[in-house]
Amino acid sequence: MVTEPLTKPALVAVDMRPARRGERLFKLAASAAGSTIVIAILLIAIFLLVRAVPSLRANHANFFTSTQFDTSDDEQLAFGVRDLFMVTALSSITALVLAVPVAVGIAVFLTHYAPRRLSRPFGAMVDLLAAVPSIIFGLWGIFVLAPKLEPIARFLNRNLGWLFLFKQGNVSLAGGGTIFTAGIVLSVMILPIVTSISREVFRQTPLIQIEAALALGATKWEVVRMTVLPYGRSGVVAASMLGLGRALGETVAVLVILRSAARPGTWSLFDGGYTFASKIASAASEFSEPLPTGAYISAGFALFVLTFLVNAAARAIAGGKVNG
């Protein structure tokens, strides 16, 4: 039997140039998209700095330590951000301290304890809270929450007044227009952000780690404590910083709640005054004149830098593993 020799299949040349060209175009488009956010941030920073410098040069007060903010006379500008920083920091940190433990608890409940028929609608309700307008939170805070908090504020002031956070502030406790009230309202506002991100991070905990812990006899709480929470640490930090960013920049709700103060702040939760954002919003009518406008833009630039420092600190705390 004669067998025919095997013949090699003919090689067909494939032109890879269109694919390579498409890859280059896609890489260029992706790089351009990635560069857009960097360019936008740089442009914003340059705009703020350029508009702020003339007013800073004309300023007759120390920008960082002065409690004045007088822009009524172009020739005698005197403004500083000491009180703005104090009110912003106290209200935002109060919100963070109150919101994060509750948000983490809700996230753990939704991912590891709640039955599915309850988890989804409850999670949707938490997410829906983020859609409530800021002005609604502000009105609810000053008309509903503030009167309820007044007895608590008086109790804290009476019994813990020796501690600087609870001593008598620069506004009356009556009416509740204090940092204490603003911080609690802000904690409700940032709750959905921290909860939503923490929930998604906890859901990504490797199933094999959870099953291994259960196989070793761990209870559900021990699984959460030793597996879920350590795995989601950097995600919770990232969520907290996003919530803090929201609190730092919140304007309308804080403007509605906080009572203006005639005296400098004392680093008490029972002080009134303005945050960076609410001070800028309250003076929109002055933005027709360059130098007074520049004074408020200077405050905006300080807030801009503060948010960057907060995010840098978050990455350092999370060991560089903060996502987002």
UniProtKB/Swiss-Prot annotation:
Keywords: Cell membrane, Membrane, Phosphate transport, Transmembrane, Transmembrane helix, Transport. GO terms for cellular component: plasma membrane. SUPFAM superfamilies: MetI-like. Induction: 5-fold by phosphate starvation, part of the pstS3-pstC2-pstA1 operon. CDD domains: TM_PBP2. Signal peptide: none annotated. The keyword Cell membrane applies. The chain crosses the membrane at residues 30-50, 90-110, 125-145, 174-194, 237-257, 290-310. Disulfide bonds: none annotated. It is found in: Cell membrane. The keyword Transport applies. Part of the ABC transporter complex PstSACB involved in phosphate import; probably responsible for the translocation of the substrate across the membrane. Belongs to the binding-protein-dependent transport system permease family. CysTW subfamily. The complex is composed of two ATP-binding proteins (PstB), two transmembrane proteins (PstC and PstA) and a solute-binding protein (PstS). This is Phosphate transport system permease protein PstC 2. It comes from Mycobacterium tuberculosis (strain ATCC 25618 / H37Rv). The gene is pstC2.
